[in-house]
């Protein structure tokens, strides 16, 4: 697929941002390398990770996903071809957005990734215990130093995002170029009713996570059947009449396009105002094949899905 520009950056990326949260969690190093290789074979170049991935797994301490990515890029010698996004704030040993923490955390991530720069560095969540001026000043220093090319926000409200951007404008700091928030066909209110207007007004990129509703919008969850997945418990909220109606419509549209249910769900998301590249992860090469070619939907198909889920 053709690479697309990310607003307010010089970056051009694949329409699907590959989620790295599974690397070192449900996908070991060998599986992760296979998925990454397959993604690049499809011209993929945009990979999302975080220092906290996957601290929650027994035996892990954080930087597990970053470490796998670093080894893979070193082995392939392709760092210059890959757009890497990582995050700071949620790792237990590097929590929050103080200037001191950000300065230390970026060096930890650079070491794990075996690189001397990060393409997009996110504030993983808002930290209201630290003044935005301090956080943004620290991020600006990283951009000026060359350790980070662009900065972005994740899990910010529209109000806080607008405030952060305004501070950066006044102070002459680097500005957030993207927002990564929870958004999919089944969960629209939080983003559309809050942050989306700010994203659109400021001309930055929305890069939504959980675009497949923790896997529910792949169609693998069927009524009365149990799915063996580390994410199965997280889809319970979608296993209802509305959820299955949406999957049924996705299935019908997918048949028309000769593609997968997941591809259609991501196609709807990619077509929403402000959205640049949805994020989705794959534990296996087979799962990657279901998501890597995002469907291009007609206006009527987009409207039908929107009407069903509004």
Q: Where in the sequence are the language-model features?
A:
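N-terminal binding-site loop/beta-alpha segment at the start of enzyme catalytic domains
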Residues: 1-80, 144
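Short, acidic/polar
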Residues: 28-39, 97-112, 161-166
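Beta/alpha (TIM)-barrel catalytic core signal, keyed to glycine-rich beta->alpha loops juxtaposed to Asp/Glu
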Residues: 130-310
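Active-site groove signature of glycoside hydrolases
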Residues: 110-129
């Amino acid at each position: 697929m053709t690479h697309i520009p990310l607003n307010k950056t010089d970056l051009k990326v694949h329409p699907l941002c590959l989620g790295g949260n599974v690397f070192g969690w449900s996908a070991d190093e060998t599986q992760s390398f296979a998925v990454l290789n397959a993604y690049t074979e499809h011209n993929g170049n945009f990979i999302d990770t975080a220092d906290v991935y996957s601290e929650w797994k027994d035996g892990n301490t954080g930087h597990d996903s970053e470490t796998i990515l670093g080894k893979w890029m070193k082995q392939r010698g392709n760092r210059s071809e890959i757009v890497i996004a990582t995050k700071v704030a949620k790792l237990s040993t590097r929590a929050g957005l103080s200037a001191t923490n950000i300065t230390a955390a970026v060096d930890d991530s650079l070491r794990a990734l075996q690189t001397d720069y990060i393409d997009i560095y996110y504030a993983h969540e808002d930290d209201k215990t630290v003044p935005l001026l301090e956080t943004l000043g620290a991020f600006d220093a990283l951009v000026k130093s060359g350790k980070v090319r662009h900065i972005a926000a994740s899990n910010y409200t529209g109000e806080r995002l607008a405030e952060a951007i305004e501070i950066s404008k006044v102070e002459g700091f680097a500005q957030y170029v993207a927002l990564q928030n929870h958004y999919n066909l089944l969960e629209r209110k939080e983003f559309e009713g809050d942050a989306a207007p700010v994203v659109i007004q400021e001309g930055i990129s929305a890069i939504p996570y959980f675009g497949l509703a923790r896997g529910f919008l792949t169609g693998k969850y069927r009524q009365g059947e149990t799915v063996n997945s580390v994410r199965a418990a997280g889809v319970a909220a979608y296993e209802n009449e509305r959820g299955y109606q949406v999957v049924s419509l996705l299935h019908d549209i997918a048949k028309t396009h000769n593609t997968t249910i997941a591809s259609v769900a991501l196609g709807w998301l990619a077509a929403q105002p402000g959205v640049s590249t949805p994020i989705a992860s794959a534990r296996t090469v087979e799962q990657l094949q279901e998501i890597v070619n995002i469907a291009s939907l007609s206006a009527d198909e987009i409207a039908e899905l929107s009407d069903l889920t509004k």
